[in-house]
UniProtKB/Swiss-Prot annotation:
One Gene Ontology MF term: ribosomal large subunit binding
InterPro entries found in the cross-reference section: Ribosome_recyc_fac, Ribosome_recyc_fac_dom, RRF_sf
Biological processes annotated in GO: translational termination
GO cellular component: cytoplasm
Alphabetized UniProt keyword annotations: Cytoplasm, Protein biosynthesis
Signal peptide bounds: none
Domain of life: Bacteria
Gene: frr
Protein name: Ribosome-recycling factor
UniProt keyword Repeat present: no
Length: 185
């Protein structure tokens, strides 16, 4: 019962870190990155579909992304979706390809994006702490119901705290890495 609660909590914490990693990857740095388009969706035959499923995305140069839609009829829709996104880029369309030049970030925009990264990291840490709190409640319930002894639950609580600290540290490292990427000129 205790092992199950700890395993469940660790699994959820792992997912929270994965979500944080995905969220941070969508924040644009000064370099071209295919991941920056993962959240952009277009209406494809009535279904909201991510651009990543409708086109191949390549990065031939550090500041250039080339998007080649699988269907030529989708070029205009993809271009419009990118232009209307919050990426701050201006795509050009040559009929079959979309080229996106990634402009240099201004110092002010870099600071803004660092704040955004820290905010996403903080959200992830709150999520991990909530998972810990729920697992602690489960451990207290196990103790109260007499399913496990005081010592076992105490050890499990220490393990849970250690695991929580480990995942919070991972999130801090992700944010620190992203901050370094953003502030690098």
């Amino acid at each position: 019962m205790i092992d199950e609660a700890l395993f469940d909590a660790e699994e959820k914490m792992e997912k929270a870190v994965a979500v944080a990693r995905d969220d941070l990857s969508t924040i644009r740095t000064g370099r071209a990155n295919p991941g920056m388009f993962s959240r952009i969706v277009i209406d494809y035959y009535g279904a909201a579909t991510p651009i990543t499923q409708l086109a191949s995305i390549n990065v031939p140069e550090a500041r250039l992304v080339v998007i080649k839609p699988y269907e030529a009829s989708q070029v205009g829709a993809i271009e419009t979706a990118i232009r209307n996104s919050d990426l701050g880029v201006n795509p050009t369309n040559d009929g079959t390809l979309i080229r996106v030049a990634v402009p240099q970030l201004t110092e002010e925009r870099r600071r803004e994006l660092v704040k955004q990264a820290k905010s996403k990291g903080e959200d992830a840490k709150v999520s991990v702490r909530n998972i810990r709190r729920k697992a602690m409640e489960e451990l207290h319930r196990i103790r109260k119901d007499g399913e496990a002894g005081e010592d076992e639950v105490g050890r499990a609580e220490k393990d849970l705290d250690k695991t929580t600290h480990q995942y919070i540290t991972q999130i801090d490292e992700l944010v620190k890495h992203k901050e370094g990427e953003l502030l690098e000129v």
